[in-house]
A protein has these predicted regions:
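Mobile, glycine- and charge-enriched loop segments
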Residues: 1-5
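N-terminal glycine-rich anion-binding loops that anchor highly charged ligand groups
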Residues: 6-38, 58
């Protein structure tokens, strides 16, 4: 295995990819924007910018319920906007891994 120098967000994106990520939906904002920008470079991962944090969370939760490993990225304050689908997922559960950053 070869070594590669990565910045933190590039390393997160690489880890998600190597962990089997299939869907990434994010709302842009520092410091998490670079994660999705890096994920978008992988052809076999569907990635999108959502219109808001709630939609990004809904896409990630829905993908995970359908069995695809997913990622949802946003600023920390955006979690307030995404709270409804996050709380719903906590009691409905998911069927595949889901990362929120």
């Amino acid at each position: 295995m070869s070594k590669k120098l990565l910045i933190g967000n590039e390393a997160v994106a690489r880890g998600l990819y190597e962990g089997g990520l299939r869907v990434a939906s994010s709302y842009p904002g520092t410091p998490s924007t670079e994660i999705t920008e890096c994920i978008a470079k992988y052809d076999d991962v569907y990635s999108e910018w959502a219109p808001n944090e709630k939609v990004a969370m809904e896409v990630a939760v829905g993908s995970s319920i359908a069995g695809a490993r997913s990622f949802c990225g946003m600023k920390h304050v955006g979690l307030n906007v995404a709270a409804d689908p996050l709380f719903t997922a906590s009691y409905t559960g998911v069927n595949a891994g889901m990362v929120i950053a």
